Amino acid sequence: MKTRVTELLGIRYPIVQGGMQWVGRAELASAVSNAGGLGTLTGLTQPSPEALVSEIERCNSMTDAPFAVNMTIFPSITPPPYEAYIDAIVGSGVKIVETAGNKAIDFWPKLKAAGISIIHKCVAVRHALTAERLGVDIVSIDGFECAGHPGEEDIPGLVLIPLAARALKVPVIASGGIADGRGMAAALSLGAEGVNMGTRFQVTREAPVHAEIKQALVRANERDTRLIFRTLRNTARVFRNAISEEVVASEKLGCQFEDIRHLVAGARGRKALESGDTNEGIISAGMVIGLIDDVPTCQELLERMVRECREHLARAQSYCQ
């Protein structure tokens, strides 16, 4: 397939594995890239910039294809050493970086000076226009269906994708609610030139996630997500389990972050992914879990998606004859 996204990134298919905390490691990123998509290492999954350098080296040993590093950068009372992580990425020769967060802008000049292509994740067209004006190469637009942080305006992809495609000159990648070739065909028809998937790649054989977590997501339906942190205006879409239900109940009663910190700690979420206990912690998941019913290899997934995409685009075209 050929779009501006495949041309800019040097990949065979316009399919991107989004950054996922604890999941975006070398075994998954390399498998996606080897299958013709763009794999992504999650920078802050690594405990230090030095560990990130080692993970980049490990990924390089597993694929000759391009891959990206994700850096999610938000204001924080005790932020990680973002500058050192960025320096590690630049020094390792990575050529593609996916950024997210309103403080990512501070690091774009350094990335651009190093010849790095920037994909920036946005949940609103006005933010995407600012990112375009400041020089990002590609915008990844997240609809309300997505896992992680969909923003506070609840605009679904069916509206957000064409709005972004109409407003922007840079290529748009559609993110949120996509798991198969049907969704990919829809995204391309709406004006996107690529798709981004997180939850779908979490449920592949190569994903470094316990098999029971993968099977729980396979068994789930589209109603099995919850929105947490709504009252804190930092909304996140996560898998419905005992922990997320307790968080939602606490928010309904009125709570501060400190009241639920012990429930949502990142270490608990990581333990859940590694142990297979679905009720151990918060597990990120999008509404797309309703469309996931198997655990393929990344190669099988991408080849199937591209085949289905072509079939659905051809079928839609036949209606116009």
Predicted regions and their residues:
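Active-site entrance/lid segments in N-terminal catalytic domains of soluble metabolic enzymes
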Residues: 1-167
